[in-house]
From Swiss-Prot:
InterPro entries with a match to the protein in the record: ZFPL1, Znf_RING, Znf_RING/FYVE/PHD
Residues covered by region (Disordered): 212-232
Biased composition (Basic and acidic residues): 219-232
Zinc finger (RING-type): 53-101
TM annotation in the entry: 264-284
The name this protein goes by in its record: Zinc finger protein-like 1 homolog
Zinc fingers classed as B box-type: ranges: 1-43
């Protein structure tokens, strides 16, 4: 369980693998539509994730996506084609996630932002409307693809070559008559690349994620994020972080900080310090504390025998 960092501050067990933060269902729908999100316990067990679609094996950022009730993310077009291949008489329970075999259609009495968005996306296809008991719309019918017939291959052409026993042809070596083998190219799943000395065979190793550009140097996480690493994850937060959290909850983090906002923050801190000082002094005064040496007789001038104080007597003449 964790606390989402949005202004709603909801307790959630969902965790974004790409941004490494706890997210509630509201943030999942609004701010993380194409991110890989699973439970926090799964993140603690295994931190590896695949940013590609499980059906077409391409990156999820290419095209519209759909998030099922089991939190698995797929391309909407791939999932629509996959589900439309089922027979029309398939029951709603027969449509299951291709990753975990959990039912695609959520229960009727279950309500959440994620499920509401899922139902709205499923209503865009007639196979889902039929399973949900909704009327089928003609404008949502899938177009029939006209497959052009493949023409038969042309018959092989045989060339008639005449051979003669000329002396020039006898000088050709024996191995020259063998047909030349074309170069063979193999692709292996790894990150290294090498080639052997034989010029006919070339080995090339392919990257695991060929769709991603190797020149992309954008950081995965922001530099000013609140990193929940292993060192300070369960430590007690200082007071300044608590005050900064209240400030962000009220004013947000989207507005860039300028000198005016920093000055306001400094004035606010000085005001709190002055208020705390006045409160401490008032409490000490009401408790009767007048200083460290207020009850020490050594500092009482009337108890010192070397100090003589004139007593006001009416019998003594006044000078």
């Amino acid at each position: 369980m964790g606390l989402c960092k949005c202004p709603k501050r909801k307790v959630t067990n969902l965790f974004c693998y790409e941004h490494r933060v706890n997210v509630c269902e509201f943030c999942l729908v609004d701010n993380h539509p194409n991110c890989v999100v699973q439970s926090y316990l799964n993140w603690l067990t295994d931190q590896d994730y695949d940013p590609n679609c499980s059906l077409c094996h391409t990156t999820l950022t290419q095209g519209e996506t759909i998030r099922l009730n089991c939190l698995h993310l797929l391309h909407w077009r791939c999932f629509d084609d996959w589900a439309a291949s089922f027979p029309p008489t398939t029951a709603p329970a027969g449509y299951r996630c291709p990753c975990c075999s959990q039912e695609v259609f959520p229960p009727i009495n279950e309500v959440s932002p994620l499920i509401e968005k899922l139902r709205e996306q499923l209503k865009q296809s007639n196979w889902a409307r039929n399973a949900l008991g909704l009327p089928v719309l003609p404008e949502l019918n899938r177009p029939v693809k006209n497959i052009a017939p493949i023409p038969p291959p042309p018959p092989p052409q045989v060339k008639h070559v005449s051979y003669d026993d000329s002396p020039a042809q006898k000088e050709i070596p024996i191995h020259h008559n063998r047909s030349e083998t074309p170069a063979t190219h193999l692709e292996m799943e790894d990150t290294a690349s090498y080639s052997v000395s034989n010029s006919d065979v070339t080995f090339a190793r392919k990257k695991n994620f060929a769709s991603e550009s190797s020149s992309d140097t954008r950081p995965l996480l922001r530099q000013d994020r609140d990193a929940d690493n292993e060192e300070n994850k369960y430590k007690r937060r200082p007071t300044i972080d608590w005050m900064r959290g209240l400030w962000r909850a009220k004013h947000g983090t989207g507005v860039p900080e300028d000198r005016t906002s920093g000055r306001k923050m400094a004035i606010f801190v000085m005001f709190l310090a002055l208020l705390a000082l006045i409160t401490i002094i008032t409490v000490l005064k009401r408790a009767g504390y007048n200083g460290e040496h207020s009850s020490d007789p050594m500092f009482d001038p009337m108890a010192n025998p070397n100090i003589r104080v004139a007593v006001d007597d009416s019998r003594l003449p006044h000078l």
